[in-house]
Amino acid sequence: MKMDFLPKSVLKISALTFAIAATASCTAMATGTDHQTANATSSTAITLGNAATTSGTNDTVAIGSQANAGLNSATAVGGQANAAGLGSTSIGWQSKATAERAQAFGHLANASGVRSTAVGEAAMAGGNNDTVAVGNKANAGLNSATAVGGEANAAGLGSTSIGWQSKATAERAQAFGHLANASGMRSTAVGEAAMAKGATSVAVGNKSMAGGMNSIAIGNEAKASKDNQVVLGNAGQVQSSTAAQSGTVRIVTIDDNGTLGTMMVDYYQKAK
């Protein structure tokens, strides 16, 4: 009696086809080394890497040594990346996205607020919700804060800090420019090293400073240190304030080029 035997390769393919067909409605894949195996526990999960883990009930992805995708629709890519929030994404070595829909991209990036986004090495988007930190070591600390630039710090509620080492540390403060600093509530600082210290103060220009409440300083190195004071430019130091006048009294002058300046009243009277 003659018997025909199928090649081993055909048998292996047939077995693989049977296994795929048997698990078509429940797809889970886990691969790792012989020493530390990956663990895929959800019905639709992809887990690649030593000690990588996926949890939740569906659509989780963990790729990298000790990567973890903890809840539904979470994605973790990179060594020790941790996407622990529902629908979160964590990409980069030791990156963390620990809140719902949080997004972390970069080495040590950390997005801990709901719908927060952290992009850059050691960028941190905290608060409870809707924070954005973009740049190496950028920090958005409270709700709805936005920090963009290396070491930018938006520490106030709803604050915005854009520029390298810029700071917006009060509620709704706005800082734009390298080393710009808005520390007064609802203050605005625009320009390199511009400083808005008073509440609702405005400083526009490199090294400008608005220190008083409601004060405005416009121009490079312009300084408005009193409440409700307005200073335009640097050389002439044209000033305006609602406070009563004291000390030396000046008048505003303008030349043929349209340049503003100030002159002491006594000097003006003698010049006449």
What are these regions (language model features)?
Residues 30-42, 46-55, 59-65, 78, ...:
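Small/polar residue-rich beta-strand/coil "junction" motifs that cap repeat-based extracellular fibers
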